[in-house]
A protein has these predicted regions:
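Metabolite-binding pocket within alpha/beta catalytic cores that recognizes anionic/polar moieties
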Residues: 2-151
Length: 151
């Protein structure tokens, strides 16, 4: 039995994916969330389509002034990519399910690889600014988690 709250989320995801799919010829292999440190990567892309978040059904809209709020469809290094200019934060009032909605839409479109950048602190004194990290776990004191409930 499917949990009663998951069906509307799946329908919204399918609607958003269908809308985005109308705007590209080749399914994207990668989703790039252009956060801190990756914003200029958009300048390296061959951009075919720019979709403002507020035009994509059910997509959250970033309230952070420095976030452009656009989904870019194109190529980078010859690979088909989707790139998000701006992401969503818990402190903006979004639920975890809303925050991860674009990632789930990307998966529905066939994306297999997600690249995210962010600014963070670290406890290990051997870490230096600009180090690349692979996150395989985290400490969450928020009391909410994007993996809670049906996935």
């Amino acid at each position: 039995m499917i949990h009663k709250t998951i069906e509307p989320a799946r329908a919204q995801r399918a609607e958003a994916a269908a809308f985005i799919q109308e705007h590209f010829e080749t399914a994207p292999e990668y989703l790039l969330i252009l956060g801190t440190g990756l914003g200029q990567l958009a300048e390296e892309m061959t951009i075919d389509t720019v979709l403002p978040y507020d035009e994509i059904p059910h997509f959250p809209v970033s309230t952070v002034e420095s976030h452009a709020g656009k989904l870019l469809l194109g190529r980078l290094g010859g690979k088909p990519v989707m790139a998000m200019q701006g992401r969503f934060h818990y402190y903006e009032g979004y639920s975890m399910q809303q925050i991860v909605f674009p990632v789930r839409v990307a998966k529905a479109l066939g994306v297999q690889t997600l690249l995210v950048s962010n600014a963070c602190g670290g406890l290990n004194p051997n870490f230096e600014r600009g180090d690349i990290m692979l996150i395989n776990d985290h400490i969450n004191f928020l009391g909410d988690n994007p993996l809670m409930g049906p996935n």
